[in-house]
């Protein structure tokens, strides 16, 4: 399971310079250059999506649910008291793929906002669990990008490239929802709104992130 998760980050590594380039081009590049960068990003996301599906080859649902998940579920409220350390309960969310900077970085570059969905507050909170340099990278891109602003007033070609990039991320998140069902919901026999390892409502979080990604698409204008 963890090998497959690392595989997603490995597949996404070549996109880091693409994100940096697209962010820079959004400030002073041409529409054609920015469209090309977004096209490269969309192509790279195909490999990231394929890497996510490898989890089915590396770990079966029963093994994950019964032998892995109990140890990464975390301990939110009421927390756990560490004897000899503190009398106050320690509260920590469990291991979650949302703690990877990868997808948050992609959202930041494209200007995808999750504030209107429950996913937003959780995604912001888990940044505290990222390695500091990763968190700073996400913050820098989020503050420096003008991609969505440029696309809104850009050419049809640029808008189409942007929407294709969004569609690839949405497809990734849709695949993630299917995995969550097969690896958590189905083995538990529970309703879809059970909590994930991060402590959030699983179905609400995943569907919210997918919806805000899809909703970010821009209707192409008639500009050539």
Where are these regions (language model features)?
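Surface-exposed peri-terminal alpha-helical interaction modules
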Residues: 1-224
């Amino acid at each position: 399971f963890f090998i497959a998760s690392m595989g997603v980050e490995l597949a996404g590594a070549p996109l880091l310079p693409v994100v940096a380039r697209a962010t820079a081009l959004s400030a002073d590049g041409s529409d054609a250059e920015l469209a090309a960068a977004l096209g490269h990003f969309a192509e790279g996301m195909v490999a990231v999506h394929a890497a996510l599906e490898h989890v089915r080859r590396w770990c079966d649902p029963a093994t994950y649910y019964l032998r892995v998940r109990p140890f990464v579920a975390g301990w939110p409220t009421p927390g756990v008291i560490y004897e000899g350390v503190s009398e106050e309960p320690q509260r920590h969310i469990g291991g979650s793929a949302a703690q990877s900077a990868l997808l948050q970085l992609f959202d930041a570059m494209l200007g995808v906002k999750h504030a209107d969905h429950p996913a937003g507050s959780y995604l912001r909170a888990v940044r505290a669990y990222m390695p500091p340099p990763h968190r700073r990278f996400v913050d820098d891109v989020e503050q420096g990008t003008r991609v969505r602003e440029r696309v809104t007033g850009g050419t049809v070609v640029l808008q189409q490239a942007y929407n294709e990039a969004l569609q690839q991320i949405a497809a990734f998140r849709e695949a993630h929802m299917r995995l969550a069902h097969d690896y958590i919901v189905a083995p538990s026999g529970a309703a879809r709104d059970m909590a994930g390892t991060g402590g959030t409502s699983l179905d609400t979080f995943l569907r919210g992130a997918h919806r805000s990604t899809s909703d970010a698409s821009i209707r192409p204008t008639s500009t050539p």
